[in-house]
């Protein structure tokens, strides 16, 4: 038993040890015990609860508004020690599958992909739900509102999202202040913060390297890992920066900024990765990966959203797939896994690959690890499975690891990349 009950009616408490006055007087009613941890926190039960009740309610709302409200609820829940504890009890995995990467020890290989929390609004919430790392952004140098609304759509039968957000975010200056406030109030987050760097829409392509570099410089002290996003389909001509000249110029400039800041602040340089699109040939993918590695990138994120669409017999999904923008979710799974395997074959085992695209359960994550991913991320999976996805994936990976002949998750990486 956790041994405490807090009720608002008479401010009475039953607990072991001393609680601060503000907790005793709080207007909440929380009962935590072994029954909660042993029953309600089981990932399958919590996942079913979300699918039966949470997801149907969100279905009646505009996709972007539902996203914003869910993020606000997570932020609110993580702002109070009691509700933050409840998040940990309900959603945090109870197993450890450690992975060492970039000088950090990740509790397991599962993290949050960029796009879910663009402006770093719910960092403590993501940590409380058990993710091993969180990627904020895309962050652009300048604040921008993105494309006209509506711009986010759900295809429920295919478990896919289509968006044309257009790098809407608060901009690097405001996000720097938000991260600084977070550190001043709460200290550094207990898990690594990754920062996805995007190009400001008004910045010409031939000045993109300066735009990325300025955002990197502004957020350098607050992020642990940085991802250069040259693959969003929702910023005009952005994917042209994946060619040799554009990618090389951006990487060299950002690496130069990285080295200068590390020297100036007497610190270690920060890992810098690139994120690529799925809409290219195998030969193009291999060329981009080798170009990035040759020019000093510390790894690659595979992959961003796709402009391709699957066939469907469901009218609502067909309407969504008719929308312009990038698609994520289950239909991207096989393509993403194929790309991971392709890159792993091309670059060998010593270059980190972050796998993202269509992860909705432990089997999806396991397949990406086998294909060669060092870590994996999800975005759409959280929309359709809810916050219990982390526990589902991590516990499922643990079960598969025990049933395999591998001693650790690190031993799984790339075992089926041939």
Placement of each model-derived feature along the sequence:
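Active-site entrance/lid segments in N-terminal catalytic domains of soluble metabolic enzymes
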Residues: 98, 102, 111-295, 309-312, ...
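Glycine-rich beta-strand-to-loop/alpha-helix junction loops that act as flexible
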Residues: 113-114, 275-277, 353-359, 379-380
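Glycine/Thr-rich beta-alpha phosphate-binding loop at enzyme active sites
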Residues: 84-93, 233-246, 291-349
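Extracellular/periplasm-exposed beta-strand and loop segments of Gram-negative cell-envelope proteins
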Residues: 4-27
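Alpha/beta catalytic cores of nucleotide-metabolism and tRNA/nucleoside-modifying enzymes
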Residues: 41-90, 150-153, 157-173, 177, ...
């Amino acid at each position: 038993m956790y041994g405490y009950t807090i009720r608002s009616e008479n401010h009475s408490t039953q607990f072991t040890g001393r609680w601060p006055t503000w907790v005793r007087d709080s207007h909440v009613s929380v009962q935590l015990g072994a029954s909660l941890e042993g029953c309600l926190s089981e990932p399958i039960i919590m996942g079913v609860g979300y699918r039966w009740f949470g997801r149907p309610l969100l279905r009646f709302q505009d996709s972007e508004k539902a996203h914003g409200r869910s993020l606000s609820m997570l932020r609110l829940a993580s702002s109070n020690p009691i509700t933050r504890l409840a998040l940990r009890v309900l959603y945090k995995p109870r197993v450890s599958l450690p992975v060492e990467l970039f000088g950090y020890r990740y509790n397991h290989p599962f993290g949050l992909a960029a796009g879910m929390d663009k402006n770093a609004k719910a960092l403590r919430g993501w940590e409380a739900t058990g993710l091993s790392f969180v990627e904020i952004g895309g962050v652009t140098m300048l604040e921008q509102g993105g494309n006209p609304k509506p711009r986010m759509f759900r295809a429920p039968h295919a478990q896919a999202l289509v968006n044309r957000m257009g790098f809407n975010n608060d901009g690097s200056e405001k996000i720097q202040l938000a991260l600084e406030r977070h550190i001043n109030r709460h200290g550094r987050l207990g898990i690594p913060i990754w920062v996805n760097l995007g190009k400001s829409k008004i910045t010409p392509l031939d000045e993109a390297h300066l735009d990325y570099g300025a955002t990197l410089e502004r957020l350098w002290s607050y992020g642990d890992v940085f991802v250069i996003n040259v693959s969003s389909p929702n910023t005009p001509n952005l994917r042209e920066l994946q060619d040799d000249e554009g990618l090389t110029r951006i990487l060299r400039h950002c690496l130069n900024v990285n080295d200068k800041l590390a020297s100036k602040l007497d610190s270690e340089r920060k890992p810098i990765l690139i994120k690529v699109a799925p809409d290219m040939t195998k030969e193009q993918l291999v060329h981009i990966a080798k170009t990035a590695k040759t020019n000093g990138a510390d790894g690659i994120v595979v992959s961003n959203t796709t402009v391709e669409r699957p066939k469907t017999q469901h009218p609502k999904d067909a309407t969504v797939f008719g929308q312009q923008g990038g698609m994520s979710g289950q239909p991207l799974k096989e393509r993403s896994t194929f790309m991971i395997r392709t890159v792993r074959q091309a670059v060998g085992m010593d270059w980190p690959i972050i796998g993202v695209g269509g992860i909705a359960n432990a089997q999806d994550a396991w397949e990406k690890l086998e294909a060669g991913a060092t870590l994996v991320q999800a975005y759409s999976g959280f929309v359709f499975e809810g916050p219990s996805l982390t526990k589902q994936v991590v516990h499922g990976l643990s079960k598969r690891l025990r049933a395999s002949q591998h001693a650790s998750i690190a031993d799984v990486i790339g075992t089926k990349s041939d």
